[in-house]
Amino acid sequence: KGKTAILIDDMIDTGGTICSGANLLKKEGAKRIFACASHAVFSPPSYERLSSKDLFEQVIVTNSIPVIDNYDFPQLKVLSVANMLGEAIWRIHEESSVSSMFR
């Protein structure tokens, strides 16, 4: 109760799982709820579920899957993975360590 909750998942597709978790946390008294996922599949009806103004303080995803232009709401933050992927490709080409990027 009264705490900040961070929900982390590998992907958000319809938003059902992450919204169910957020609703439970809200019911238990979470003060703020953040959702984070690597891949934003965003199939219908995810927009309606995620953009609810009273559920998430912020929904944070990467652009590993392009987020369509008209899929925008105030709580959505899309982080670019372009530099990291470019660096990984370069290291593979140069036959150097990719794992050292994450140490």
Specify the residue positions occupied by each region the protein language model found.
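PRPP-associated nucleotide enzymes
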Residues: 1-103
